Regions:
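Conserved N-terminal entry element of GNAT/NAT acetyltransferase domains
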Residues: 2-27, 156-159
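A short, internal acetyl-CoA/4′-phosphopantetheine-binding micro-motif in the GNAT/acyltransferase core
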Residues: 90-97, 126
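Conserved GNAT acetyl-CoA-binding A-motif
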Residues: 113-125
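Active-site/acyl-donor-binding loops of N-acyltransferases
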Residues: 139-142, 146-156
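Acetyl-CoA-dependent GNAT
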Residues: 23-88, 112, 143-146
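Conserved acetyl-CoA-binding loop-helix of GNAT-fold acetyltransferases
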Residues: 98-111, 134, 138
Length: 159
C-alpha cells in the first residue's frame, strides 16, 4: 500500500495484470454506471443508481474503484451518516470476481472511514448484498455490524 497525498492507493500484480484501487474520479462516472449495470441485478441497479448520484454530489471521496489495465472492474460506494461509516454497495465485474478485488476495495474504504474518525462501521444488509456478506464476514464484520434498517440512510432519500 502506498499513500499518495490524501488518496489511498492499493496495487497488486497477478502475472501480467496489475490492479489498483483508487479514489473515484468524475471521468469514471460512465464506467462505474456500466459496471453496476453488468454486476448488479436490474432491481438492485435501480435502487443503487440514485444513492450513487447523491453520494457523488456529497462526497465522492467515499467511492472507490478497482482498475485493471485501464478498465474499472470494481466499485464500492460508502457513506457516512451520523458519524457512522457504511459500506453501501459493492459491484465487481463477473469476470473478475474471487480475485481479491472486493477485499481491496473494503480495505481502502475502511481506511477512509478510520481517517474520518467514524464511531462505527456498518455493512448495509439487504437482499441485494447477500452475495457479498461472506466477504464482509471474512473481513471481521459479523452480524452485529450488519445494518438491516439502513433504509434511513441519507443517501437513499433525497432531502
Amino acid at each position: 500500500m502506498t499513500v499518495l497525498s490524501q488518496f489511498i492507493y492499493y496495487a497488486y500484480e497477478k502475472g501480467d495484470i496489475t490492479m489498483h484501487v483508487r479514489s473515484f474520479q468524475l471521468s469514471d462516472v460512465n464506467s462505474v454506471t456500466e459496471l453496476m449495470q453488468i454486476a448488479l441485478s436490474e432491481e438492485c441497479y435501480k435502487e443503487t443508481v440514485g444513492a450513487f448520484a447523491r453520494q457523488l454530489s456529497w462526497d465522492s471521496g467515499l467511492i472507490v474503484v478497482a482498475e485493471e489495465e485501464g478498465e474499472i472492474v470494481g466499485a464500492l460506494i460508502g457513506t457516512i451518516d451520523q458519524n457512522h461509516g457504511c459500506y453501501y454497495r459493492i459491484a465487481i465485474h463477473p469476470d473478475h470476481r474471487r480475485m481479491g478485488i472486493g477485499k481491496s476495495l473494503v480495505e481502502s474504504m475502511e481506511q477512509r472511514f478510520q481517517q474520518r474518525k467514524v464511531s462505527r462501521i456498518w455493512v448495509a444488509g439487504d437482499k441485494h448484498n447477500s452475495a457479498a456478506m461472506p466477504l464482509y464476514e471474512a473481513m471481521g464484520y459479523g452480524a452485529s455490524q450488519i445494518l438491516q434498517a439502513f433504509q434511513k440512510l441519507s443517501i437513499l432519500a433525497p432531502h
